[in-house]
């Protein structure tokens, strides 16, 4: 039977995609192709496209944005409820962690993490297809053949269909993938064919299902139970509908053709040891099982394939990238692949309505190459999560119980970094929901270039060279002498230098508690301060600048909540700097000559940090709310801190100007001396040593700020020209000194990061 006899429409001259599989991947691809103006036909083996097999699907922001572009997301959203709470428990039911990370993900991406019946999503996708006649059920494909100008699909019922390409969206046991291998093997064409044929394996199995509301399991919550060799995942959806997964490690790694298949009686045997195990602090799994609507037991196949296409055959979804379901990205990655494939086909068909076979092959290879690196990463992440939750090794257990619970929003950061670069449909407008202010997708729309770590290292290399040069010329120096033994000129130089350091220490304190800088060198700034006090600030500060710049890229503070400085820290910052740095410094500089406290002053970096923590402990910690609802709440305190730092530095400059010492007149000569005679620094007096330290430390600080301004411009967050940036900073240096310039520059950067993103 020909296509014309079945659907009343032959291929003609139009480019057509034959989609095998009415899966999530297949139906989303059909929607994408429709919007791209590309003809398609969907062949589904079952007698309906939306069977209830007990499966659920998690819709994450990377998939939701594409569904929103296609106009189907609102219907899906009506069947879901935005979750808030993530609960992590041990196998004994002890609560390890309860956080609102799911709410934070929605704030960052514009879309909630939602679960619903897979059947519901399939029904929506099918019902909202403009041409349902192009979806044919009971069409189990047997073979695919390449013709001179077309590709032909033969079905079990004897029907045949032709198109320009065949897209395999027929799941993990894909017939189309096997047909692709058959053609490639016949022509000895694919380099890693043998490896692909042996790629699939399974180390775990999963009983998954859907239950009605279970008493004791709160709405808007996800529950994960971790234990040796098994784990639970339960997501509570709309009307407290319960979507659940029971994971268990197999006794051995299985590969085809020895992959086990399970019956309903196997489910009853499997579930028996799990019934009295905890899924929450008070609920055991038997309560979930008693309310079961549907369920299924299956092995969890894992496979990463090297070849996604051959000739005019291409695969997507589980047919070509099969991952474990622990991170919920299987369906979303299928949606991504459907969009990515359509983007390539759209570009090709806009060039010509009748592309050559070689053009088609090249386009499919581009799709393959564009998806492989990102897919490899997510498959590995999913596998790692499965093993982490089942304590596959001692280190998995340690990480689960003693690292992850104390990592703050690190997992949210990892998730958002992964989805931020997700593909979209390039030929359709972006949904308003994804472009809300502060979302990762809005930030990505700025089109800033990705900054690779090696380039950050190279740009920051002058800091290391400065440290080496300073050590070779100045040795180990400290500027904490007995102040009462200084001359008046030396004391004045030291006052100005220490005054200019005030903004630097304020900035370092801010960076040490900024949310986005968790687990970076920025949190250890006080150690650099101690090294500077004992071995020389001219080494410690540039080294801090180097490590901070390399680690703390724009990615770490691009989201509003990661730029945020918790209010209890921001509001006590000035007090901590005043009590921990300014007061001890004033005592050292202007105290009684009979009181030598300079040895205590060496410890001020630690003192300032301790005082900051103590003061902050008395202020309310509103971070949980502010990071989502009001991430700019810290700005008034930061403006105050930067302003006070800049004013104090400016006051010391004014104090210096009204003294007989003409520091600015000697600045150029100092710079020339450092350039032409660096070795002469070994023989300078204390006044010159202070001035040289002043010049090197604050000069490196301004260079550090310029590097961060460069990041702002690269990310297209800063509209001001380099002439304006350099002019403002240079003018401030001349009038108020480098310390005030540092305060102004960092305050400017803070304002840019906190401002609403303008896409025009």
Swiss-Prot record:
Where are the glycosylation sites? Answer: 518, 621
Topology in the lipid bilayer is annotated as: Multi-pass membrane protein
> Where does the UniProt entry say this protein principally localizes?
membrane
The enzyme's E.C. designation: 1.-.-.-
**Looking at its record, which EC class is this enzyme?**
oxidoreductase
User: GO molecular function terms here?
Assistant: FAD binding; monooxygenase activity
Q: Where is the protein situated, by its record's location annotation?
A: Membrane
Protein's GO biological process: terpenoid biosynthetic process
Q: Which domain of life is it from?
A: Eukaryota
A Pfam family of the record is FAD_binding_3
Pathway(s) served: Secondary metabolite biosynthesis; terpenoid biosynthesis
Give a yes or no for keyword Transmembrane in this entry. yes
User: Required cofactors, per record?
Assistant: FAD
Q: Where is FAD bound in this sequence?
A: 44, 58, 118, 318, 331
Which keywords does this Swiss-Prot/TrEMBL entry list? Answer: FAD, Flavoprotein, Glycoprotein, Membrane, Monooxygenase, Oxidoreductase, Transmembrane, Transmembrane helix
Q: Name a single GO cellular component.
A: membrane
- The membrane spanning regions, by residue number, are 18-38, 460-480, 492-512, 527-547, 570-590, 599-619, 641-661, 725-745
Similarity annotation: Belongs to the paxM FAD-dependent monooxygenase family.
Q: What does this protein do?
A: FAD-dependent monooxygenase; part of the gene cluster that mediates the biosynthesis of the meroterpenoids nectripenoids A and B, as well as cochliquninone D and isocochliquninone E. The pathway probably begins with the HR-PKS ntnH that catalyzes two chain-extension steps to form a reduced triketide, which then primes the SAT domain in the NR-PKS ntnG to initiate three more cycles of extension to give a linear hexaketide corresponding to the polyketide part of nectripenoids.
Protein name, entry field: FAD-dependent monooxygenase ntnK
Gene it is expressed from: ntnK
């Amino acid at each position: 039977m020909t296509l014309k006899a079945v659907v009343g429409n032959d291929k003609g001259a139009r480019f057509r995609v034959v989609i095998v599989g009415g899966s999530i991947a297949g139906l989303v691809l059909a929607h994408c192709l429709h919007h791209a103006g590309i003809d398609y036909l969907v062949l589904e083996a079952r007698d309906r496209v939306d069977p209830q097999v007990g499966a659920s699907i998690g819709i994450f922001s990377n998939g939701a944005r594409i569904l929103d572009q296609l106009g189907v997301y609102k219907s899906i959203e009506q069947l879901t409820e935005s979750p808030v709470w993530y609960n992590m428990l041990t196998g004994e039911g002890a609560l390890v962690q309860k956080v609102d990370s799911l709410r934070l993900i929605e704030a960052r991406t514009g879309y909630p993490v939602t679960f619903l019946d897979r059947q519901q999503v399939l029904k929506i996708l099918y019902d909202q297809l403009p041409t349902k006649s192009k979806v044919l059920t009971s069409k189990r494909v047997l073979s695919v053949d390449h013709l001179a100008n077309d590709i032909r699909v033969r079905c079990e019922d004897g029907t045949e269909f032709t198109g320009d390409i065949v897209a395999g969206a027929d799941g993990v046991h894909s017939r189309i993938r096997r047909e692709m291998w058959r053609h490639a093997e016949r022509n000895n064409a694919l380099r890693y064919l043998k490896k692909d044929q042996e790629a699939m394996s399974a180390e775990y199995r999963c009983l998954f299902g859907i239950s009605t509301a279970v008493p004791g399991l709160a709405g808007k919550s996800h529950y994960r139970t971790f234990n040796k060799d098994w784990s639970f995942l339960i997501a509570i959806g709309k009307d407290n509908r319960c979507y659940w997964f029971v994971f268990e490690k197999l006794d051995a790694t299985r590969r085809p053709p020895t992959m086990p298949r399970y019956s309903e009686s196997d489910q009853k045997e499997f579930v028996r040891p799990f019934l009295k195990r905890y899924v929450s602090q008070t609920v055991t799994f038997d309560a979930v099982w008693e309310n079961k609507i549907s369920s299924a037991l299956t092995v969890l196949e894992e496979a990463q394939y090297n070849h996604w296409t051959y000739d005019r055959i291409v695969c997507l979804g589980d047919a070509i990238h099969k991952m474990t379901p622990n991170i919920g990205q299987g369906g979303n990655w299928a949606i991504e692949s459907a969009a990515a494939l359509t983007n390539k086909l759209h570009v090709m068909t806009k060039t010509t309505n009748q592309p050559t076979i070689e053009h088609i092959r090249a386009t499919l290879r581009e799709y393959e190459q564009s998806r492989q690196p990102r897919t490899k990463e997510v498959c590995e992440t999913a596998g790692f999560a499965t093993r982490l939750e089942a304590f596959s090794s001692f280190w998995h257990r340690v990480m689960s119980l003693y690292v992850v619970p104390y990592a703050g929003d690190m997992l949210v950061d990892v998730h958002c970094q992964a989805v931020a670069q997700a593909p979209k449909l390039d030929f359709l407008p972006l949904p308003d929901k994804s472009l809300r202010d502060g979302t990762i997708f809005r930030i990505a729309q700025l089109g800033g270039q990705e900054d690779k770590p090696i380039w950050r290292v190279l740009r920051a290399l002058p800091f290391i060279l400065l440290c080496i040069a300073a050590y070779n010329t100045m040795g180990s120096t400290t500027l904490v002498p007995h102040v009462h033994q200084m001359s008046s000129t030396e004391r004045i130089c030291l006052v100005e230098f220490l005054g200019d350091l005030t903004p630097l220490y304020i900035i370092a304190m801010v960076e040490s508690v900024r949310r986005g800088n968790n687990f970076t060198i920025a949190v250890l700034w006080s150690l650099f301060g101690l090294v500077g006090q004992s071995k020389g600030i001219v080494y410690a500060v540039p080294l801090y600048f180097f490590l901070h710049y390399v680690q703390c890229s724009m990615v770490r503070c691009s989201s509003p909540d990661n730029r945020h400085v918790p209010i209890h820290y921001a509001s006590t910052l000035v007090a901590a700097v005043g009590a921990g740095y300014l007061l001890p410094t004033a005592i050292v500089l202007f105290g009684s000559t009979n009181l030598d406290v300079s040895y205590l002053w060496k410890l001020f970096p630690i003192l300032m940090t301790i005082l900051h923590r103590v003061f902050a402990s008395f202020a309310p910690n509103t971070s949980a709310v502010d990071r989502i609802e009001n991430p700019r709440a810290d700005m008034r305190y930061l403006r105050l801190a930067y302003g006070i730092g800049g004013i104090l530095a400016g006051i010391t400059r004014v104090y210096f100007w009204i003294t007989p010492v003409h520091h600015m007149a000697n600045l150029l000569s100092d710079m020339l001396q450092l350039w032409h005679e660096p070795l002469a620094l070994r023989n300078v007096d204390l006044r010159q040593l202070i001035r040289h330290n002043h010049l090197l430390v604050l000069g490196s600080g301004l260079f550090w700020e310029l590097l961060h301004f460069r990041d702002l411009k690269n990310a297209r967050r800063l509209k001001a020209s380099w002439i304006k940036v350099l002019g403002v900073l240079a003018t401030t240096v001349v009038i108020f000194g480098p310390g005030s310039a540092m305060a102004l520059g960092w305050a400017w950067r803070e304002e840019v990061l906190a401002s609403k993103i303008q896409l025009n």
